[in-house]
């Protein structure tokens, strides 16, 4: 195994220097051009002190600068920290300080927005001249050095940083190439926001085999028409969806009959939510039977480097509701345990545990949480306790059976309900609160916040306050004021009762007293 991911890319540059590597709208970069630009940036960064385990932030829109910036950070020897320019300044500042990032690579228009609110040095990638030596730098990384740090939602009210090493990423990318080989004839669509780790394989898989990456225009990942147009005009062969977005995409194809426009598409990967049999059946009807496109279900937490299982979906009609998450990828082992940590046999539901080369180093500045989640299970086995319930079938495939805690996925985005609740509790006037998830349809999942207060609080005030700390995807769709929180016999908030209260008849801002509607005022969220 190579020591670092950038070395694999540099070896590919030697093989295919003049082949197109990156496509963004009407711009392209060849392998040689991308290598030279990222080398020029890397020299600048290394002269500034970037080296192994140095975390460098990158806050850009999807663009060619995004690719050059990430590759430049790695070539300098550092680890990249993706930051969303759409997140609140307070959240960004916490991540910057917590990670120890002293430098943020950005773009001019983003720099102007944040230069007064963020305490960090910022460098605009679109203002660099990219002159000087374009030759490769000496690789100064070991397999155990950090390659990236991605922050996920945290139950304590603050996001937590997951530290991934080069060896883990290389194992994941090399497995993907062995299992689903691609070549210079293939083009991967990069459409996942880079603050989520699915983007990592979209960012690097193509780069080690001579394929292309086509970068979808910012914000267009939610629009099927834009995905179809980009796929058609760039002969995209590989893409990823969250199941709920796949459902919306398939619905669009069914209504418009535009399946023939994406005949180049040969493989779709899904992850982030439970895949259902109806997704597979509709996919096969619209894409497999006509175009021969294949569907693969992936599963994995950020703490185990993107994905740890894969299940190739059948091309015939299936009737069972849930779809397996598959078998472990190479150099990964998985098993389920009971509440005492004892391994369970096949067919028994327990907590899913992961071991192997894909495990993260741990959480940034969270030694206690790292010790709780990353456990030395035996003398030679370190595991990550996922918090997911699962069982292993007799054929070796794993079935997902929900969560132990209050972590949820909404449109594929990982959310700790405790983080929302912690922020809501800090809002003046809120005495107690709880947030639940409601599945309204196959494509629509909503967050509903229940809060207890002496007086009613204006909806816009609640939303405005939460937006100071949380990204938009974590802002509840509905707020329900209750006179008194329902409690279980043990004194905990009874979320099952709240789930019954959070039905369609309650609008975006509703007041409940004793479980019945007291006052209701509807507003669009």
UniProtKB/Swiss-Prot annotation:
EC primary class: ligase
Reactions catalysed, as given in the entry: holo-[peptidyl-carrier protein] + L-serine + ATP = L-seryl-[peptidyl-carrier protein] + AMP + diphosphate
Annotated Gene Ontology cellular component terms: cytosol
GO BP terms, alphabetized: amino acid activation for nonribosomal peptide biosynthetic process; antibiotic biosynthetic process; secondary metabolite biosynthetic process
Pathway it works in: Antibiotic biosynthesis
Biological function: Involved in the biosynthesis of the linear aminopolyol antibiotic zwittermicin A (ZmA). Specifically adenylates L-serine and loads it onto the holo form of ZmaH via a thioester linkage to the phosphopanthetheine moiety.
Protein known as: Zwittermicin A synthase ZmaJ
Species assigned in the record: Bacillus cereus
Gene this protein is translated from: zmaJ
């Amino acid at each position: 195994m190579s020591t670092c991911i950038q070395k694999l890319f540099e070896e590919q540059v030697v093989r295919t220097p003049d082949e197109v590597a990156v496509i963004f709208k009407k711009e392209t970069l060849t392998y040689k051009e991308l290598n030279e630009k990222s080398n020029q940036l890397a020299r600048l960064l290394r002269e500034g002190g970037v080296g192994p385990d140095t975390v460098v932030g990158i806050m850009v829109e999807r663009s060619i600068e995004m690719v050059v910036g990430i590759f430049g950070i790695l070539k300098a020897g550092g680890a990249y920290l993706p930051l969303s320019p759409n997140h609140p300044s307070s959240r960004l500042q916490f991540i910057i300080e917590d990670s120890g990032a002293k430098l943020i690579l950005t773009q001019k228009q983003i720099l102007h927005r944040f230069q007064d609110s963020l305490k960090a040095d910022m460098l605009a990638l679109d203002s660099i001249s990219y002159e000087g030596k374009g030759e490769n730098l000496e690789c100064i990384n070991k397999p155990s050095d950090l390659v990236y740090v991605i922050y996920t939602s945290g139950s304590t009210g603050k996001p937590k940083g997951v530290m991934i090493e080069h060896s883990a990423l290389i194992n994941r990318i090399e497995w993907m190439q062995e299992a689903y080989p691609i070549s210079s004839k293939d083009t991967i669509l990069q459409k996942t926001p880079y603050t989520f780790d699915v983007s990592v394989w979209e960012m690097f898989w193509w780069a080690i085999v001579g394929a292309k990456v086509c970068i979808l225009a910012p914000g267009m990942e939610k629009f099927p028409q834009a995905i179809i147009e980009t796929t058609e005009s760039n002969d995209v062969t590989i893409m990823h969806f969250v199941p709920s977005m796949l459902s919306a995409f398939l619905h669009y194809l069914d209504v418009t009959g535009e399946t023939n426009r994406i005949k180049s598409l040969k493989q779709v990967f899904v992850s982030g939510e439970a895949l259902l049999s109806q997704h597979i059946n509709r996919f096969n009807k619209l894409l497999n039977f006509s175009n021969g496109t294949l569907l693969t279900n992936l599963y994995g937490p950020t703490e185990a480097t993107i994905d740890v299982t894969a299940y190739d979906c059948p091309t015939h009609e299936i009737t069972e509701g849930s779809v397996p998450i598959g078998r472990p990828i190479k150099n990964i082992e998985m098993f389920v345990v009971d509440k005492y940590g004892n391994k369970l046999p096949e067919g028994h539901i327990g907590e899913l545990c992961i071991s192997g080369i894909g495990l993260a180093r741990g959480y940034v500045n969270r030694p206690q949480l790292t010790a709780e989640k990353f456990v030395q299970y035996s003398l030679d086995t370190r595991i990550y306790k996922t918090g997911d319930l699962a069982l292993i079938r007799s054929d070796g495939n794993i079935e997902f059976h929900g969560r132990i805690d209050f972590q949820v996925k909404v449109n594929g985005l990982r959310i700790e309900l405790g983080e929302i609740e912690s922020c809501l509790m800090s809002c003046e006037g809120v005495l107690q609160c709880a947030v639940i998830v409601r599945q309204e349809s196959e494509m629509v999942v909503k967050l509903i916040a229940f809060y207890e207060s002496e007086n009613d609080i204006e909806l816009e005030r609640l939303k405005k306050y939460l937006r100071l700390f949380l990204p938009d995807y974590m802002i509840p769709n509905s707020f329900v004021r209750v006179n008194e929180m329902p409690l279980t016999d043990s004194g905990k908030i009874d979320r099952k009762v709240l789930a019954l209260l959070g039905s369609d008849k309650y609008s975006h801002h509703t007041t409940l007293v004793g479980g019945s509607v007291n006052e209701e005022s509807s507003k669009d969220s």
